[in-house]
């Protein structure tokens, strides 16, 4: 939702919020505890540069609601561009296979390599954001994403296509990795719930929306190359919008700029609370590469929740090979018409988004502490909806049965996947507030490999088992996953008490 790094999307508490993404921010987990004090607060250091009182207009939290909504819309659009690019490639897989004389599985690598690029991006964009703020890493990421769409669009061989797809994934991870931190900068905890729900809905729904556009483009005279030009056009327009319309929201960057102006005016001793807190290479290696794997093998909550969420993410990208088989090969629909059933899943995702926002706002008033296990009832509900939808989809897939059954089944699949995915992220952030970057890093790494791997074996599974039994297999596995949130809802507090890394209260 890249789903990439995702944030604590609908949290209305004041606990640290790290990133979709995890797929969404790679900021330090103490981002809120490091909020700069204002000059209205007592301070002992006369050279400490802070906000000019609680109503300082330079503080993004004090911008008008309309302006913050505009800035949020830019971030949403950036994520829309890159997430559409992640899956619109699947629409042209048939033409690409014919053009380069390869099998469809080889072409599917274009999706898998894009998602693998998501695993490389966050360890780069997170530290850059901490050092240089949100805006310029976003500018660099979107500009390079746009540039590397071009070689894919004009490629003369498959190698160029695959390398270009990987690089667009690396640079396309920028908005996914940075958006969570920017929303934390602007919105208070209660407001942030809605803002982040919109972002995660975009990140989760855009890959489903992409084939609706891509299939009709490929079926027209424009062909598969225009799907990549479309990604390039969207990325370029977003780059221009970011350069000229996106303000810096990171308090550290704003206050450092203010301190630099004061130094230039004649006071060389001023500083900010953010000075000297940039992470070195060793810190980055430990936080993003070493500690995540250690946590996976020592933290049962992280391990099991990551497996569950990775399975959900894998199903999301498996859809882009299973739907063409179910509707084009089995039912004989045209390329464009075969994309319309994705609408059912989109509706389900929107329903899931609404449920999560409403229930979270009901549970958290912004003034009371979050109990991590309060996230789990929605995860359990989503986990129950998912196999129901998969079984409906599976056993109405016979071409002699009306197609409406499969579309209806797609809706609970979308709702269930969204609810499980979102609440998995929220639960991990609540359980591991002080090491959320590492926990989400481990989660993202495993999740991205599932997302990259499922489209590779999906065609073999659906061709060998048939649509009914292949989808039913996913349904049975989904049922087997339901005890995970049930276990933690019943015994989560006790399990957390065994860990030195988790929140115990």
Swiss-Prot record:
One GO CC annotation: plasma membrane
Keyword Transmembrane among UniProt keywords: yes
Domain of life: Eukaryota
Disulphide bridges, residue numbers: none
Key word Transmembrane helix present: yes
Membrane-spanning residues: 69-89, 106-126, 135-155, 166-186, 193-213, 226-246, 280-300, 301-321, 337-357, 376-396, 401-421, 440-460, 468-488
Localization (cell): Membrane
Keywords: Membrane, Transmembrane, Transmembrane helix
SUPFAM superfamilies for this protein: MFS general substrate transporter
GO molecular function: transmembrane transporter activity
Function: MFS-type transporter; part of the gene cluster that mediates the biosynthesis of oryzines, natural products with an unusual maleidride backbone.
Stated family: Belongs to the major facilitator superfamily. CAR1 family.
Name used for this protein in its record: MFS-type transporter oryN
The gene coding this protein: oryN
């Amino acid at each position: 939702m890249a789903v990439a790094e995702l944030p604590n999307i609908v949290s209305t508490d004041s606990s640290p919020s790290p990133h979709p993404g995890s797929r969404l921010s790679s900021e330090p987990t103490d981002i809120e505890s490091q909020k700069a004090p204002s000059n209205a607060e007592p301070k002992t250091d006369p050279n400490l540069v802070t906000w000019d009182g609680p109503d300082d207009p330079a503080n993004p939290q004090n911008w008008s609601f309309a302006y913050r909504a505009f800035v949020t819309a830019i971030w949403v659009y950036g994520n829309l561009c890159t997430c559409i690019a992640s899956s619109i490639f699947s629409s042209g897989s048939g033409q690409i296979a014919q053009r380069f004389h390869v099998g469809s599985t080889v072409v599917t690598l274009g999706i898998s390599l894009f998602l693998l690029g998501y695993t490389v991006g966050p360890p780069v964009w997170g530290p850059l954001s901490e050092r240089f703020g949100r805006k310029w890493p976003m500018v660099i990421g979107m500009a390079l994403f746009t540039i590397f769409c071009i070689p894919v669009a004009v490629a003369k061989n498959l190698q160029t296509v695959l390398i270009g797809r990987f690089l667009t994934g690396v640079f396309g991870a920028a908005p996914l990795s940075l958006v969570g931190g920017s929303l934390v900068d602007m919105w208070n905890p209660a407001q942030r719930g809605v803002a982040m729900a919109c972002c995660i809905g975009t990140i989760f729904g855009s890959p489903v929306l992409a084939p609706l556009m891509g299939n009709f483009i490929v079926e027209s005279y424009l062909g598969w190359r225009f799907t990549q030009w479309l990604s390039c056009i969207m990325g370029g327009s977003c780059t221009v919008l970011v350069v000229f319309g996106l303000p810096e929201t990171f308090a550290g960057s704003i206050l450092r700029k203010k301190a630099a102006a004061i130094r230039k005016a004649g006071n060389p001793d001023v500083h900010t609370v953010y000075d000297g807190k940039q992470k070195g290479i060793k810190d980055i290696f430990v936080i993003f590469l070493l500690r995540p794997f250690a946590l996976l093998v020592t933290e049962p909550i992280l391990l099991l929740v990551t497996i569950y969420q990775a399975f959900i993410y894998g199903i999301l990208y498996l859809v882009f090979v299973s739907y063409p088989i179910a509707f084009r090969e089995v039912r004989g629909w045209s390329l464009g018409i075969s994309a319309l059933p994705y609408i059912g899943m989109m509706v389900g995702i929107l329903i899931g988004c609404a449920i999560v926002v409403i229930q979270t706002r009901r549970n958290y008033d912004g003034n009371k502490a979050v109990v991590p296990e309060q996230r789990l009832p929605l995860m359990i509900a989503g986990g129950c909806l998912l196999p129901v939808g998969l079984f409906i989809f599976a056993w109405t897939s016979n071409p002699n049965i009306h197609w409406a059954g499969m579309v209806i089944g797609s809706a609970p699949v979308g709702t269930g996947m969204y609810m499980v995915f979102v609440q998995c992220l929220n639960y991990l952030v609540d359980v591991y507030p002080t090491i959320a970057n590492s926990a989400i890093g481990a989660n993202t790494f495993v999740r991205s490999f599932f997302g990259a791997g499922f489209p590779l074996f999906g065609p073999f599974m659906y061709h060998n088992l048939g649509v009914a039994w292949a989808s039913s297999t996913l349904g049975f596995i989904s049922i087997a996953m339901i005890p995970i949130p049930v276990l933690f809802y019943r015994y989560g507090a006790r399990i957390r008490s065994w860990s030195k890394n988790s929140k115990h209260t």
